[in-house]
Amino acid sequence: MNRFIMANSQQCLGCHACEIACVMAHNDEQHVLSQHHFHPRITVIKHQQQRSAVTCHHCEDAPCARSCPNGAISHVDDSIQVNQQKCIGCKSCVVACPFGTMQIVLTPVAAGKVKATAHKCDLCAGRENGPACVENCPADALQLVTDVALSGMAKSRRLRTARQEHQPWHASTAAQEMPVMSKVEQMQATPARGEPDKLAIEARKTGFDEIYLPFRADQAQREASRCLKCGEHSVCEWTCPLHNHIPQWIELVKAGNIDAAVELSHQTNTLPEITGRVCPQDRLCEGACTIRDEHGAVTIGNIERYISDQALAKGWRPDLSHVTKVDKRVAIIGAGPAGLACADVLTRNGVGVTVYDRHPEIGGLLTFGIPSFKLDKSLLARRREIFSAMGIHFELNCEVGKDVSLDSLLEQYDAVFVGVGTYRSMKAGLPNEDAPGVYDALPFLIANTKQVMGLEELPEEPFINTAGLNVVVLGGGDTAMDCVRTALRHGASNVTCAYRRDEANMPGSKKEVKNAREEGANFEFNVQPVALELNEQGHVCGIRFLRTRLGEPDAQGRRRPVPVEGSEFVMPADAVIMAFGFNPHGMPWLESHGVTVDKWGRIIADVESQYRYQTTNPKIFAGGDAVRGADLVVTAMAEGRHAAQGIIDWLGVKSVKSH
């Protein structure tokens, strides 16, 4: 009889641990580098309250094997296996499989060419501990069924039938025999999500202190106790771009072991006290949490913040006494999240690092783009002290291409990493968008942060005082919310956020929208700006809008806004802030050294190249927003860490694996 994996739907949590274990088992027990390679051979199905996992049944008279015209699918060692060399990707097996468990996977084999092959459960053939999905299911909902196991199952059921154990009078006895709660019962008994406390609303409206108060110990314990620990490598870990060991450090919080938790946190994350505050967890780890739909996700971000804040306040610092210095030096251009992450990993591998940045403090947009009410700037100052103690050297107020040349860096250092972010505001091409009273989001936020920090403003980034003004912010992302909430704190008489789609389709965090509303912001949805209106002095006085409805989805699956004919109106405004996103700024000093950029100005570098994130100049690596375009802090850090590994491999340094 062929062996197969059987799922117990009554025990299944729907946690996806089996999928992640499957993919890692076929990738040397490592996470794949991108979502494009995430092809589990087992699939979790959720429908209403039903949850189960589906995979190949290894049929005795397998339709996939019978349908294969090239003999690529056959019986091997009590299972049905695919011979990848024989497979021609004809899809006959996909059509023939009655359970829908066959896939065709495309694998790059040469420039512009791919090989299509059939993909199915192989029972982890050759794996010492057997099928990874069975080993890693936290609810024991999966088992490998053999002929012996099947016979034993049938015998057990016959005995239960003979004893009439399914009759009502046996129910109380059965309950007494099962004192240990199953994972499903634990999930059903999970208390509701607990949110962190906030500053009083009046204090929020007039000040720039962080609005979220840190978790108390009892709050952290309560939230940690809600985690089901869905497998060794859980879905929250996979959906985090850094692949943080989330359930493991939550377990350590439950045990009261903050020192071990912070060490584990720093194995994958350079700035956990930052990501705990500014990550959009609702779109990443918390959005994937197994208990999200029933009880609300575990507040992972607040636990992460709690771990770091507690440990750093107690004086925890990274121990690099075991690191052996190597005779290699790397220059990093940009002290933002990508650059700092790259510097961190290189330093932990003994490489000498100098970071160059044009700003007076490290952090890039963490420091100067994100307002203080979301991220206390003292955190970055403390982190600079930590990095400096680790041996990282900083050259601040130093702009590459102006104060120091790339030529000199290439001459002095063994490699260069470029993590400069994106600073050029996207324009909408509206009439009069360069008129007085119209501001780009980033210079507005940078000048505000410098004013709060007591730093000197620059002529090209003057402080904009919105006190008493009627302000309209165009855009629907987190940057737009930052502008809205900043203008309110400076005493604007009225602040409106205008967005061309509906609220459900806003790209920004729901949490940020909620906070903006609480602080007094107004929202105008389904409106598209067509022109900026000027008064007799040439100053902006309003915005001409068209109302919109949602049409067909675009390439990203978001429904396009379609203007409604005859719906034009003018919204009065004393100041307009345009928050449409960012593009990479020009870097002629980089392109002149053979570094290729795409038509949008993004540096061409890939995590899947021979050396991760190596550019077309082999001595120069790049990552973060300069490569992918404006994105999240956590994705920039992930790319900086990957690039550091690429540099280590290219330099021939013996790598110290962090996880």
From Swiss-Prot:
Disruption phenotype: Under aerobic and anaerobic conditions, the disruption mutant is able to grow utilizing ammonium, L-alanine, L-arginine, L-glutamic acid, glycine, or DL-serine as the sole nitrogen source. CDD domains: HycB_like (cd10554). [4Fe-4S] cluster 1 binds at residues 12, 15, 18, 137. Residues 3-22, 47-77, 78-107, 114-147, 218-252 form the 4Fe-4S ferredoxin-type domain. Keywords: 4Fe-4S, Iron, Iron-sulfur, Metal-binding, Oxidoreductase, Repeat. [4Fe-4S] cluster 4 binds at residues 68, 87, 90, 93. Binds 5 [4Fe-4S] clusters. This is Putative oxidoreductase AegA. It comes from Escherichia coli (strain K12). The lineage of its organism: Bacteria, Pseudomonadati, Pseudomonadota, Gammaproteobacteria, Enterobacterales. The gene is aegA.
